[in-house]
């Protein structure tokens, strides 16, 4: 019986559990909160108070998706967390009982609210309250911001990056587009669990994590304190949680809103601080209380320029993108969340430049500025939010004393206001102003400075991170602390007020936390290149100068040593001279006494003169017959002035050696003889006749080279003008033709003018080539029997239009006897006449140009043509006439006209080659007359061979033509020309394709460009000729030099033609191409007779057999190669047997022999090289058979 109470209690417990499980919720036993935050009493209306008194209990629903930071249960089923603290405050503020129920999800909680089972739903973190007409939401209870997290050791990673990065998140928050705004190439990995997402960043699997600041910071504080760090907060997208009530519960909604309004930022910060070690932004829940004027200012100035000093840790640093980091970077991040202002950094090297030397308007805010009264005249300062003492930094030593000694070098930054005060306190110290405190730490460590003035925070950071066992710091007594704040241009008081309000809203504990965070931050590297670049360049320059000067000094010493060796050699030569004067010196040397008599000489002296004239050389130097008569007087005068001097004097003059005058470089010196009262003269000379002549010849050649260079430059300038002018005209006419506004007559005229301009350009190139041919001796005259009056008349007629356009009278008269022909090169004669006539019309502005031609008989078979071209132009001066027939020479009037300056030079040379003469007579302002005389052979026309009537050009029919050119425009033009003449044309884009087409098909003519990629026209011709191909080949080239044509003919071309190729030229050369006859080709391998006998001369059957043979052998041969490589001997022999059988049917003897050899050769590793060689022979032979089969099929189609 004593167990009955326990059994009853157990049954009751089981019943209650079963009953509880039947419900949709779990009811918590209460709220556990140790928060001592209090609220001011809520000002509720009587109506609201009565409602609360009647209500007595508020049932609040939550759901399981609430995170542990916001809401969780302890072991006694009591709720804890930030939301629990807020609910506890609500309970105390309203003095009402709260009942909390946990539902499985948000929807079930909302269903309970709508059905009246609960009064309030406390939502999870959402972007906005639910849109429901039956539900009302209060103002947000909690606001969270997206936080960017990375590893602690990589805290200086850029906050934005265009490089590929991996970013983790939870439950698709924040959205992709938000992440891609800062990381366009980010790979986003979504996790379902926050711990897993953060662990992936800590392990290095992902670069960043982005999530809610409250939940993320709580997780970091618990599990990742020493590995992860929040580096930035984003302004959006924010998340909120709300109290949700039914729409009809108006009083309840108003009471809850009063409660939310009573939660000041300070209260919210204290509530969150119990649960968050970092990332507590609860002080941002309520916006700043800005005036309308300040709000308007922010709208007008959303983006501000921030001056950033990257060398002032931990206050301010920059990452690789130049973004502001450090304490000031985090403060600016918070200000952005408060105000929406955006900050763009402008990096400077130190605060002097930042604060006072930038132009107004170039910056808006300077973070981390140290307040001073002097600087307040230039800038505005916000209220100080960091205060730190000044310290001295010195080297750490066992006997270190915390004081400054006399003579120490102490550095102080320019922008510290302590300079004058410290100078008074320590007058015996040498104070050195520096640009930046952080950069001076290294100088203290190296001993360049004895001490440095810095702020305590800056010193602590630099020593802990870079000089932990080398430097230490101590406080400076008797000086005020440094006050750090923001500075602004004096014209921006509104910005100052806004920043002050933002700073005042930041709790001091948050500023301290940020400071400690950055002081303890590991692995932060400061790029000091800008600070030391100037010193680096100076040191580098000095080093280069030092090395250069050393090299120069070494080079100077080397030259000195070499010079010393030369002098030493001269001394040795003098000693040798004293010992053996006559044997050692090849140049003539002699000794003269003070009276001028030659007392000794060497053999070279005697050999220099003829035997007869040697006597004169031995006469006293003062004798008028002596060749050295001019030497003695100069020697005597010099000696009288410098008797003790051993200077060698030289003189260049000419002497007679008995045969000719020779130029010598004569030298003499005084030699005092200790045993004699008088000194002697040691003399000699060097014959420099050849040297002088050589120098003169070199000078002549040098002048020629200079003149050639000048002529070349003049030629290039002239050719540039002469080629550009017609090309510009052609382009202009083509541009007109591309339009649609021209009439038919205008289009014809434009085409005609463009063609004529092109012909003039070809004429210019022809002139240049004529000069080349003439000067190289390659110009060959081709004399013919010519009717000179008719030739002159036709040439004059071609210039009639030009003369008429200038209103110049052009007349042509002749006294030639009738029926006489002369033997002369008509092209050369016409070129001379055209040049002279063109010049006459060019330089005549008014008047007339007259041409007269006459024939002066010498005998019955010989005569002289005399022709004059007279104009009334500007005329030539004598100086201009002297230069007229030189290459590229132009008169002053000629430079105002177009022309190459080659025409008259060519005329002169052509007339000279025809054994004639060209002269001129000209007077300025009157005109010029050119006279041509040429001796010629003559014959009466009746006795001459009558010229055959011009036969019409007959073109061969049915030509198969292949053109090879890599330029599609050239191929198209030539194809259209040949199509116009009625020929079928095939095309190849280079020599390789042309070779392939020729091997596969028969052609009657190949026209190939000379310059092509891979295989050019010359190489293509050589390869075809190596194959014994008789195919006619014409080469085309734009290089109009004669050697290019010779190169083409030498490699086997039938013709080498110059571009452009006109229809007339094509017709002329095609007409000379023999008509293609149906000739039975010679076959090297195919036995056509056997094939005819086997097929009863059935051409169709013959072609089918040959095509079948081609198809089968092209299948069997690769199979044989593959079988041999795979070791399949049976398949190999089957393939070779089929090839052997086909060869027997067609009586292909060479193929029969090779395939038989393959069949009888056993396959082994030793015989494989021989078999492969035989297979390659089969392959080459089948390729030759393919060509012959192609020719046979084409001939019989």
UniProtKB/Swiss-Prot annotation:
InterPro entries noted in UniProt: BvgS-like_periplasmic1 (IPR049870), BvgS-like_periplasmic2 (IPR049871), CheY-like_superfamily (IPR011006), HATPase_C_sf (IPR036890), His_kinase_dom (IPR005467), HisK_dim/P_dom (IPR003661), HisK_dim/P_sf (IPR036097), HPT_dom_sf (IPR036641)
Cellular component aspect of the GO annotation: plasma membrane
Entry superkingdom: Bacteria
Transmembrane portions of the chain: 326-346, 538-558
Keywords annotated in UniProt: ATP-binding, Cell inner membrane, Cell membrane, Kinase, Membrane, Nucleotide-binding, Phosphoprotein, Signal, Transferase, Transmembrane, Transmembrane helix, Two-component regulatory system
Compartment(s): Cell inner membrane
Function per UniProt: Member of the two-component regulatory system EvgS/EvgA. Phosphorylates EvgA via a four-step phosphorelay in response to environmental signals.
The protein's name in its UniProt record: Sensor protein EvgS
Organism: Escherichia coli O157:H7
């Amino acid at each position: 019986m004593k167990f009955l109470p326990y059994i009853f209690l157990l049954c009751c417990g089981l019943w209650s559990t079963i009953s509880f499980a039947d419900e949709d919720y779990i009811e918590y036993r209460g709220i556990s909160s140790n928060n001592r935050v209090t609220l001011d009493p809520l000002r509720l209306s009587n109506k609201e108070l009565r409602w609360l008194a009647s209500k007595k209990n508020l049932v609040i629903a939550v759901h399981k998706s609430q995170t542990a930071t916001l809401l969780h249960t302890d072991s006694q089923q009591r709720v804890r967390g930030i939301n629990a603290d807020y609910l506890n405050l609500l309970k105390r503020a309203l003095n009402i009982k709260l009942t909390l129920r946990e539902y499985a999800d948000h929807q079930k909680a909302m269903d309970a609210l709508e059905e009246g089972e609960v009064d309030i739903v406390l939502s999870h973190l959402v972007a906005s309250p639910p849109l429901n007409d039956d539900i009302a939401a209060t103002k947000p209870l909690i606001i969270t911001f997206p936080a960017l997290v990375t590893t602690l050791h990589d805290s200086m990673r850029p906050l934005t990056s265009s490089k590929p990065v991996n970013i983790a998140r939870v439950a698709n928050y924040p959205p992709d587009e938000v992440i891609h705004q800062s990381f366009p190439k980010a790979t986003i990995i979504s996790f379902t669990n926050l711990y897993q997402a953060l662990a992936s960043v800590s392990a290095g699997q992902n670069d960043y994590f982005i999530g809610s600041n409250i939940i993320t910071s709580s997780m970091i504080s618990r599990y990742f304190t020493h590995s992860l760090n929040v580096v930035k907060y984003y302004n959006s997208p924010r998340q909120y949680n709300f109290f949700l009530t039914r729409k009809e519960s108006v009083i309840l909604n108003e009471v809850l809103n009063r409660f939310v309004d009573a939660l000041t930022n300070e209260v919210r910060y204290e509530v969150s601080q119990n649960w968050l070690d970092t990332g507590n932004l609860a002080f941002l829940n309520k916006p700043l209380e800005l005036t309308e004027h300040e709000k308007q200012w922010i709208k007008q100035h959303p983006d501000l320029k921030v001056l950033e000093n990257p060398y002032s840790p931990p206050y301010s640093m920059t990452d690789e993108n130049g973004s502001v980091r450090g304490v000031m970077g985090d403060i600016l991040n918070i200000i952005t969340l408060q105000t929406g202002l955006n900050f763009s950094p402008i990096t400077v090297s130190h605060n002097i430049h930042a604060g006072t030397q930038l132009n107004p308007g170039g910056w808006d805010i300077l973070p981390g500025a140290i307040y001073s009264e002097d600087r307040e005249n230039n800038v505005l300062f916000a209220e100080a939010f960091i205060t730190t003492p000044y310290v001295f930094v010195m080297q750490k030593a066992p006997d270190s004393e915390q004081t400054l000694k006399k003579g120490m070098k102490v550095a102080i930054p320019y922008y510290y206001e302590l300079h004058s005060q410290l100078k008074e306190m320590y007058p015996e110290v040498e104070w050195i102003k520096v640009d930046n405190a952080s950069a001076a730490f290294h100088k203290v460590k190296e001993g360049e400075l004895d001490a440095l003035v810095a702020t305590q925070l800056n010193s602590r950071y630099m020593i802990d991170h870079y000089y932990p066992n080398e430097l230490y710091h101590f406080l400076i007594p008797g000086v005020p602390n440094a006050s750090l704040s923001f500075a602004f241009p004096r014209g921006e008081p509104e910005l100052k007020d806004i920043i002050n309000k933002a700073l005042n809203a930041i709790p001091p504990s948050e500023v301290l936390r940020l400071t400690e965070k950055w002081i303890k931050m590991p692995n932060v590297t400061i790029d000091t290149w800008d600070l030391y670049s100037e010193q680096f360049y100076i040191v580098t320059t000095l080093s280069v100068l030092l090395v250069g000067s050393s090299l120069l000094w070494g080079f100077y010493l080397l030259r000195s040593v070499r010079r010393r060796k030369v002098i030493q050699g001269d001394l040795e030569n003098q000693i040798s001279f004293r010992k053996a004067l006559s044997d050692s010196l090849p140049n003539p040397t002699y000794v003269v006494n003070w009276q001028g008599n030659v007392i000794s000489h060497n053999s070279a002296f005697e050999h220099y003169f003829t035997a007869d004239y040697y006597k004169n050389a031995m006469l006293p130097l003062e004798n008028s017959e002596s060749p050295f008569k001019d030497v003695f007087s100069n020697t005597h005068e010099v000696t009288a002035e410098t008797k003790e001097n051993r200077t060698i004097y030289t003189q260049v003059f000419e002497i007679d050696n008995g045969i000719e005058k020779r130029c010598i470089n004569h030298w003499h010196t005084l030699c005092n003889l200790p045993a004699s009262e008088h000194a002697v003269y040691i003399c000699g000379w060097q014959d420099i006749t050849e040297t002088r002549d050589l120098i003169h010849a070199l000078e002549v050649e040098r002048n020629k080279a200079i003149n050639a260079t000048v002529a070349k430059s003049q030629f290039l300038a002239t050719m540039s003008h002469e080629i550009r002018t017609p090309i510009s005209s052609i382009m202009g006419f083509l541009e007109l033709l591309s339009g649609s506004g021209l009439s038919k007559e205008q289009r014809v005229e434009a085409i005609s003018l463009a063609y004529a301009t092109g012909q003039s350009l070809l004429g210019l190139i022809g002139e240049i080539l004529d000069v080349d041919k003439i000067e190289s001796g390659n110009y060959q005259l081709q004399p013919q029997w010519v009717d000179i009056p008719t030739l002159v008349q036709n040439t004059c007629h071609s210039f009639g239009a030009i003369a008429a356009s200038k209103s110049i009278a052009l007349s042509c008269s002749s006294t030639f006897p009738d029926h006489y022909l002369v033997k002369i090169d008509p092209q050369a004669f016409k070129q001379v006449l055209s040049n002279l006539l063109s010049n006459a019309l060019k330089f005549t502005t008014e008047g007339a140009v007259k041409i007269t031609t006459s024939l002066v008989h010498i005998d019955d078979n010989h005569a002289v043509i005399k022709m004059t071209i007279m104009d009334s132009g500007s005329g030539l001066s004598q100086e201009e006439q002297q230069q007229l027939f030189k290459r590229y020479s132009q008169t002053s009037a000629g430079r105002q006209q177009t022309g190459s300056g080659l025409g008259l030079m060519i005329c002169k040379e052509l007339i000279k080659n025809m054994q004639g003469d060209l002269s001129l007579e000209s007077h300025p302002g009157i005109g010029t007359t050119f006279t041509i005389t040429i001796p010629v052979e003559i014959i009466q026309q009746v006795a001459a061979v009558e010229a055959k009537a011009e036969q019409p050009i007959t073109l061969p029919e049915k030509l198969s033509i292949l053109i090879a050119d890599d330029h599609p425009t050239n191929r198209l033009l030539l194809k259209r020309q040949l199509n116009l003449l009625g020929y079928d044309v095939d095309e190849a884009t280079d020599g390789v394709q042309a070779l392939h087409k020729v091997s596969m098909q028969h052609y009657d003519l190949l026209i190939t460009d000379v310059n092509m990629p891979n295989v050019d026209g010359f190489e293509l011709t050589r390869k075809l000729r190596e194959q014994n191909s008789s195919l006619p080949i014409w080469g085309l080239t734009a290089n109009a030099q004669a050697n290019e044509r010779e190169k083409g003919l030498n490699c086997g071309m039938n013709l080498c033609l110059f571009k452009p190729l006109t229809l007339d030229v094509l017709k002329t050369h095609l007409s000379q191409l023999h008509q293609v006859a149906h000739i039975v080709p010679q076959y090297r391998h195919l036995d056509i007779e056997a094939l005819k006998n086997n097929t009863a001369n059935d051409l169709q059957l013959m072609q089918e057999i040959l095509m079948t043979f081609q198809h089968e052998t092209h299948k069997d041969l690769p199979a044989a190669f593959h079988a041999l490589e795979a070791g399949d001997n049976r398949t190999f022999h089957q393939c070779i047997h089929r090839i052997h059988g086909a060869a027997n049917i067609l009586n292909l003897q060479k193929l029969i022999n090779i395939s038989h050899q393959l069949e009888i050769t056993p396959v082994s590793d030793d015989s494989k090289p021989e078999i492969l060689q035989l297979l390659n022979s089969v392959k080459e032979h089948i390729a030759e058979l393919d060509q012959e089969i192609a020719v046979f099929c084409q001939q019989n189609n």
